[in-house]
């Protein structure tokens, strides 16, 4: 994540306009809007679009892996090859995982203390992120994907559409 401070309204509004719709807070981020974003970038790899905050905001790296796993989509898919039914499932998984993570205080591999030294323990449960095997005993693959980030996925569960 990047934090950028601005000292005037114009710079703030310019930055805000460069960020895509937010899956957590934007009530206008319906499936139709999500699909329109995906269709606009249909020649691109799914992980590149999910992780590019100018297209869709709010998907952290751990969420990318969890969303793709939950929807059964390989991180190696080109968007145009993903069937409509799976695209709907991807949208639903994204909303579910983001809201779940938010409601549980986010996710962390470690405990931490906030600025008031209050200890926190994030409760979001990982299914594949930073795991060796999934709940079914399948090996979790950890690899750097086209978004230049580490992605955790399960070949037996996540389909590559061609």
Give each language-model segment a name.
Residues 1-162:
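Structured catalytic/nucleic-acid-binding cores of DNA maintenance enzymes
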């Amino acid at each position: 994540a990047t934090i950028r401070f601005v000292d005037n309204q114009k710079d703030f509004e310019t930055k805000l306009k460069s960020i895509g719709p937010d899956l957590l807070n934007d009530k206008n981020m319906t499936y139709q809007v999500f699909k329109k974003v995906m269709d606009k970038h249909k020649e691109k790899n799914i992980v590149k679009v999910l992780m590019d905050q100018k297209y869709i905001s709010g998907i952290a790296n751990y969420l990318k892996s969890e969303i793709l796993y939950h929807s059964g989509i390989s991180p190696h898919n080109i968007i145009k090859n993903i069937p409509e039914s799976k695209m709907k499932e991807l949208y639903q998984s994204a909303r579910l995982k983001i809201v779940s993570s938010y409601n549980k205080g986010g996710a962390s591999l470690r405990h931490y203390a906030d600025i008031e030294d209050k200890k926190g323990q994030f409760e979001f449960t990982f299914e594949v992120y930073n795991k060796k095997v999934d709940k079914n005993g399948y090996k979790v693959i950890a690899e750097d994907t086209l978004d230049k980030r580490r992605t955790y996925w399960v070949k037996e569960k996540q389909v590559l559409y061609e």
